[in-house]
């Protein structure tokens, strides 16, 4: 596992965007051989999406031959609801880059058969081989996507019940009213995520400090699904200073020295 310790959340966004752009450019994608990118929603990746849009506008990266898969979607709200993850992705990213509509893959939270929809999504991912790079965030309780505490670390895409903590955290997007926050979501599984060639998780803010500690210094534990990153051969966590407050000083020092040349300029 790599840990990229930066000072601010803005730096996390810029580092992550530069990393994604480099991966895409090094891959040299074509229509027949697209780069497959996994994407999250929420507050944490907004800085990354903003930085990626800037890189696109500067001509430093193209998404024409990039295929995307999103992590999750709420069940029971319309696709055009302002807080659906479809709306989030188009408003904050897709509408501002050159991605082709047919290359955008999103879970349908209003599908009549949720199990069939989840299997369709898994099959679609497999049709591309695997996801080249999956970017994600992490919840205060260490959940990745909507794989809440005690989720199976070999789980696949499925419907999940959201914990009250998650609904409270997400109520900030619903006028602070938890009753407006859906109780269920479709989400990729931890196993789905681990199938990716590379995983990059963004961690910002002091409220994520315990989750970061569990991911880096804790044992692999289904109560902290982010800890499953320890099982992956190519995972990277990009974090800001406030999120590292629960880590041992020597841990932060170790990774700061190890990644020194990769942090320069950010």
Curated annotation (Swiss-Prot):
GO molecular function, a single term: glucosamine-6-phosphate deaminase activity
SUPFAM superfamilies given in the database record: NagB/RpiA/CoA transferase-like
Functional note: Catalyzes the reversible isomerization-deamination of glucosamine 6-phosphate (GlcN6P) to form fructose 6-phosphate (Fru6P) and ammonium ion.
Keywords: Allosteric enzyme, Carbohydrate metabolism, Hydrolase
Record pathway: Amino-sugar metabolism; N-acetylneuraminate degradation; D-fructose 6-phosphate from N-acetylneuraminate: step 5/5
Site-annotated residues for Part of the allosteric site: 151, 158, 160-161, 254
Regulation acting on activity, per entry: Allosterically activated by N-acetylglucosamine 6-phosphate (GlcNAc6P).
Coiled-coil stretches noted in the UniProt entry, renumbered to this chain: none
Family classification: Belongs to the glucosamine/galactosamine-6-phosphate isomerase family. NagB subfamily.
EC number: 3.5.99.6
Annotated protein name in UniProt: Glucosamine-6-phosphate deaminase
Catalytic reaction annotation: alpha-D-glucosamine 6-phosphate + H2O = beta-D-fructose 6-phosphate + NH4(+)
Quaternary structure, from the entry: Homohexamer.
Residues of the active site: 72 (proton acceptor), 141 (for ring-opening step), 143 (proton acceptor), 148 (for ring-opening step)
PROSITE patterns given in the database record: GLC_GALNAC_ISOMERASE
Name of the encoding gene: nagB
GO cellular component, one term: cytoplasm
GO process annotations (BP): carbohydrate metabolic process; glucosamine catabolic process; N-acetylglucosamine catabolic process; N-acetylneuraminate catabolic process
Superkingdom of origin: Bacteria
Pfam families xrefs: Glucosamine_iso
């Amino acid at each position: 596992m790599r840990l990229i310790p930066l000072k601010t959340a803005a730096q996390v966004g810029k580092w992550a965007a530069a990393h994604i752009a480099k991966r895409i450019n090094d891959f040299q994608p074509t229509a027949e051989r697209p780069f497959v990118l996994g994407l999250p929603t929420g507050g944490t990746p907004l800085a990354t999406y903003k930085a990626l849009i800037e890189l696109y506008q500067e001509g430093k990266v193209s998404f024409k031959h990039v295929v995307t898969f999103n992590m999750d979607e709420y069940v029971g709200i319309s696709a055009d609801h302002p807080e659906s993850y479809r709306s989030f992705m188009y408003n904050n990213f897709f509408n501002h880059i050159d991605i082709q509509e047919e290359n955008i893959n999103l879970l349908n939270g209003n599908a009549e058969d949720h199990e069939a929809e989840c299997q369709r999504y898994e099959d679609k991912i497999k049709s591309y081989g695997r996801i080249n790079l999956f970017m994600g965030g992490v919840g205060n309780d260490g959940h990745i996507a909507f794989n809440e505490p005690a989720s199976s670390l070999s789980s696949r895409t499925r419907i999940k019940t959201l914990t009250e903590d998650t609904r409270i955290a997400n109520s900030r997007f619903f006028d602070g009213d938890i009753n407006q926050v859906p109780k269920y979501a479709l989400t990729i599984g931890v196993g789905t995520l681990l199938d990716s060639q590379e995983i990059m998780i963004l961690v910002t803010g002091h409220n994520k400090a315990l989750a970061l500690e569990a991911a880096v210094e804790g044992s692999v534990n289904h109560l902290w699904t982010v800890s499953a990153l320890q099982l992956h051969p190519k995972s990277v966590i990009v974090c800001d200073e406030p999120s590292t407050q629960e880590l041992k000083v020597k841990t932060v020092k170790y990774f700061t020295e190890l990644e020194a040349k990769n942090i320069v300029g950010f």
